[in-house]
């Protein structure tokens, strides 16, 4: 049953993340994440072994890149839920909002120092037109996502 809980919590937290990006776009005109670019990067990694992409936006579109991007997005979300579950089993985290929020804030290190550089954006988005905005948005989204995971596991608590 615990694997099912991880899957459900990861997917639901990711849905909340995606819905909030749509609401945020309506409020601010800032577009949501472009999962096609994640798919393009993923396909490049698989076919060419290229971990760090250069100028990803100008590269030719790849077949099914959007679908692959969404698949990677949801797979990573489930991975985060599994990490949270493991930390709960190790009694580092509890199934609650505050621990989820802390987890989300810490988890933003992954896009800051891994995904953004891999997508050709540089560490801390330094190669983007507005690095502070990109970093702030990542922190906002990962905070919401982490809180959603913490609350999600709280729903399953005995």
Residue ranges, per PLM feature:
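Juxtamembrane/disordered regions of integral membrane proteins
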Residues: 1-158
């Amino acid at each position: 049953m615990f694997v099912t809980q991880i899957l459900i919590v990861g997917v639901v937290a990711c849905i909340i993340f995606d819905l909030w990006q749509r609401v945020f776009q309506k409020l601010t005109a800032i577009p949501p994440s472009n999962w096609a670019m994640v798919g393009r990067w993923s396909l490049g990694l698989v076919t060419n072994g290229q971990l760090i992409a250069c100028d990803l936006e100008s590269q030719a579109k790849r077949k099914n890149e959007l679908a692959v991007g969404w698949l990677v997005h949801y797979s990573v979300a489930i991975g985060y839920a599994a990490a949270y579950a493991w930390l709960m089993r190790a009694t580092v985290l509890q199934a609650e909002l505050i621990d989820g929020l802390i987890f989300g804030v810490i988890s933003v290190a992954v896009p800051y120092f891994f995904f953004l550089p891999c997508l050709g954006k540089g560490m801390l988005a330094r190669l983007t037109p507005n690095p502070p905005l990109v970093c702030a948005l990542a922190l906002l989204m990962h905070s919401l996502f982490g809180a959603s995971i913490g609350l999600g596991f709280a729903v399953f608590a005995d």
